[in-house]
Design a protein with these regions (language model features):
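A metal-dependent hydrolase signature that marks the N-terminal structural subdomain at the beginning
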Residues: 1-64
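Short coil/turn segments at secondary-structure junctions
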Residues: 5-9, 81-84, 88, 120-123
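Active-site scaffold of zinc-dependent metalloenzymes
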Residues: 51-90, 107
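Short alpha-helix carrying the canonical HExxH Zn2+-binding catalytic motif
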Residues: 88-105
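Post-HEXXH active-site segment of zinc metalloproteases
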Residues: 91, 106-134
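An active-site-proximal "capping" alpha-helix that borders the catalytic cofactor pocket
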Residues: 129-146
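Long, well-structured alpha-helical subdomains associated
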Residues: 145-189
């Protein structure tokens, strides 16, 4: 039986409260049309608002038969600040979702053993985190989501209530607005 609080697009389970934003982000990734993805609200995600990951039960399945989660916190807590997903502008949310879909694009090309190694490296290596986050941003920008990714970066880096520690972490790990603009220009050529 279908949950009345979710919406469905082919092979997707999406909370209704973010269905429009997810649909827009997915429209930039036609190659994910048949990929099973469940967008799910989660109480807490360490150091993040969203997190894409393969379902563990499918890690060793054929790459084409894997399914994924995109975990999303409804209430973001960063140090002493807290705000709700409903306070996030739509284009920012689309950018965040697009970034997470970029991770799924990356995961699809990896073997099961490689995914396990990816997870371990992500947990233990700052350099690896930076590479993975920049790859996800690059996937999103190369899929026509540059404006959304820029809106997300602008929201984070210019949000008065977010700490400088958190903003510095974002600056270190993700593409900068300047790098995003440069990538957009390169893709136009």
């Amino acid at each position: 039986m279908k949950d009345l609080n979710t919406s469905e697009i082919t092979n997707k389970i999406i909370p209704k409260s973010i269905a429009d934003e997810v649909a827009i982000a997915l429209s930039h990734y036609p190659e994910l049309k048949d990929t099973p993805i469940e967008f799910r609200f989660k109480e807490k995600i360490k150091k993040s608002f969203m997190q894409a990951q393969p379902k563990f039960s499918g890690i060793f399945k054929n790459k084409k038969n894997r399914s994924y989660f995109v975990m999303i916190t409804e209430h973001f807590h960063i140090e002493n600040e807290s705000f709700s997903i409903s306070e996030v502008p739509s284009e920012v949310l689309i950018g965040w979702i697009g970034h997470e879909l970029g991770h799924i694009m990356d995961y699809q090309e990896r073997s099961g053993i490689n995914l396990i190694g990816f997870g371990i490296s992500y947990l233990t290596s700052h350099k690896f985190i930076k590479e993975a986050e920049r790859a996800a941003d690059t996937f999103a920008v190369s899929h026509g989501m540059g404006d959304y990714i820029l809106a997300t970066k602008d929201f984070i880096l210019n949000h008065a209530h977010l700490s400088s520690i958190y903003k510095d972490r974002i600056r270190k790990l993700y593409l900068s607005p300047e790098e995003i603009l440069l990538l957009v220009e390169e893709l136009k050529d």
